[in-house]
Amino acid sequence: MSINDKPIGFFDSGVGGISVLKEAFKLLPKEDFLYYGDSKNAPYGTKKVEEVKALTFNATDFLMNKGIKALVVACNTATSVTINDLRENYDIPIIGIEPALKPAVELNKGGKIIIMATPMTLAEKKFANLMDLYKETEDIEPLPCPGLPELIEQGIVSGDVIYNYLKDKFSKYDNEKISSIVLGCTHYPFIEETLKEVTHNKACIIDGSFGTSRELKRQLKNSNMLREENRVGKVTIFNSREDKDIIDLSYKLFNMK
């Protein structure tokens, strides 16, 4: 098999990275994708750094053994902790994801920018460096959201539980003064509709899925690794939990409009 015909690997701590996979499949419809969700060990956002590194390398080895030509680390926490180590150890294009703060700043008209993310993403040096670029000129507030990925892992993406969780998190803010909300975890796009409801559609909601997918395409094109055959690609999903319910949920989220 030529390198062009090999699949693209996607990895996340659970089902969240499927939000990025959806964007990538739209942008690269001829490609085959292998997705590995580590729901057995989710969430990563409250774990120790060394544990996240070990789990990320395990997932990467799983996908490398399947013959992938590129890897997308579709997990903000794993990206912030492990991306440099991965690039040093594997000789394929490796694309990470980080909170889409730059587009939020570019769209900002003087309001508050809120970054929703896991506690670990917000605590990492990579995030601090990102904040340093803009903190002098922008009103940016990190909002840790522990427990939210766990709800989404259970398939709870709407309804009273999600609404009340978000209502509580945003109760301290004046919706009129929020310019943008950056979704700094790949699980969060699945609760975007409820988030709009809670914030009365006042804020622009931004996630990094499109930017990450565009970077994936750019790197594959520059390396002459894009699939050329005129065909419709396929998506195959694996999960460390190895039960039918989590695989069914994964495909359901992938097909969710």
From Swiss-Prot:
PROSITE patterns in alphabetical order:
ASP_GLU_RACEMASE_1, ASP_GLU_RACEMASE_2
In the record, biological process GO terms are: cell wall organization; peptidoglycan biosynthetic process; regulation of cell shape
Claim: Cell wall biogenesis/degradation is one of the keywords in the record: yes
Fetch the Gene3D superfamilies from UniProt. 3.40.50.1860
Q: Which InterPro entries does the record associate with it?
A: Asp/Glu/hydantoin_racemase, Asp/Glu_race, Asp/Glu_racemase_AS_1, Asp/Glu_racemase_AS_2, Glu_race
Identify the Pfam families for this entry. Asp_Glu_race
Q: What class of enzyme is it?
A: isomerase
Kindly state which keywords UniProt assigns to this record, in alphabetical order. Answer: Cell shape, Cell wall biogenesis/degradation, Isomerase, Peptidoglycan synthesis
Q: Which reaction(s) does the protein catalyse, per the Swiss-Prot or TrEMBL entry?
A: L-glutamate = D-glutamate
Pathway given for this chain reads:
Cell wall biogenesis; peptidoglycan biosynthesis
EC number(s) given by UniProt: 5.1.1.3
Annotated binding of substrate, by residue: D12, S13, Y44, G45, N76, T77, T186, H187
According to its UniProt entry, what is the function of this protein? Provides the (R)-glutamate required for cell wall biosynthesis.
The protein depicted here goes by the name Glutamate racemase
Organism from which the protein derives: Clostridium botulinum (strain Langeland / NCTC 10281 / Type F)
